[in-house]
Amino acid sequence: MLGRAQRTLKRKVCYSGVGVHFGKPAMLTLEPAEENTGVVFSRHAASGQYIPARLANVCGTGRSTTLSSQGGVVSTVEHLLAALYSCGVDNVRIHCSEDEIPIGDGSSQVFVDLIDQAGVEEQGQTVPIARLTHPVYYQHQDTILAAFPSEEFKISYTLHYSHNSAIGTQYRSQVISEESFRKEIAPCRTFALYNELCFLMERGLIGGGCLGNAVLFKDDSVISLGKLRFPDEPVRHKMLDLIGDLSLIGKPFLAHIIAVGSGHSSNIALGNKILEALQYEQELVK
C-alpha cells in the first residue's frame, strides 16, 4: 500500500474574519496536533466539544457543509478543509470562536496562506494512501457523480447553468496535487446568482456576503471586485468544494472523480460511497 509521512503544522496561527452566512466575526486558530489525531474542530475546548472532520459528523449541506459532534457545531468548513487536504496537513486542531468558519475572500487562498505562515513538518508515523479498486456512483435527478480507480487524484467536472449565459457550460479536468491546487483551484471564489439573493436572505443566509467574498452573476454579466481570476472560475470553485467535502473521508485516496452539477449534499453522498468501498477493500486485505 502506498503511504507517506504524516504531517502537521509547525506552529499555531490565527485568522479573524466574518462568516459568509451568519455574518458574525470569528477568530480561527490552527494548532499543531499529534500523530493520528486527524483534523479536529473545537468550539468550546473547555467543555470538550470536539468535532472530528469526518463524514459521520456531517449534519447539514445547505449552501455549505456543517459538522456536529458532542453538542458542538461548525459550518462552512469546506474551503478550509480543501486547503488542508491539498497541502497534505493530516493532523491539526482547529478552534473557531463562532459557529461558522470565516469566509476570507470566498476561496481557499487565505487558508493556504495560513498554512504557509505556520509551516508544515513531517511526523514519525505514516499515513496510508488508499486506492479505489472498483467504480462507485451516485445520481440524483440531473446530478451525477462517479469515482473510478486511478493512479492519481483527478477531478473532471461539468457545470451547466442553462439559465445564466455568463456561466453557461464549463468543463475542467485536472489532476489535483498540492502544486495544481495552489495555482489553479485555491484562488477561485464562491459565487451566486443575482436572482437567488432574496431567497438566500429569507433563509437567513449570506448575512456576511459581499463582493469582497463572492462573485455575482446576473443574466449575461459578472458583478465582481475586479475581473474573474480565471475565465472558468465557477467550475474551479465547484472543484474546490468537492475536494473539501471529500476530505471528510478522513484519509488520502486515489481516484478519478467525475462530477456533473454536484453540490455539497451529493458530494457527501459520493464520499460515503467511496468510504464504504475503501473500507470493504481494506477488510479483504486482512
Swiss-Prot record:
GO molecular function terms attached to this record: metal ion binding; UDP-3-O-acyl-N-acetylglucosamine deacetylase activity
Annotated positions binding Zn(2+): 79, 237, 241
Gene: lpxC
Active site: residue positions: 264
Natural source organism: Chlamydia muridarum (strain MoPn / Nigg)
Entries under InterPro entries matching the protein: Ribosomal_Su5_D2-typ_SF (IPR020568), UDP-acyl_GlcNac_deAcase (IPR004463), UDP-acyl_GlcNac_deAcase_C (IPR011334), UDP-acyl_N-AcGlcN_deAcase_N (IPR015870)
Cofactors: Zn(2+)
Its job: Catalyzes the hydrolysis of UDP-3-O-myristoyl-N-acetylglucosamine to form UDP-3-O-myristoylglucosamine and acetate, the committed step in lipid A biosynthesis.
Protein name, as recorded: UDP-3-O-acyl-N-acetylglucosamine deacetylase
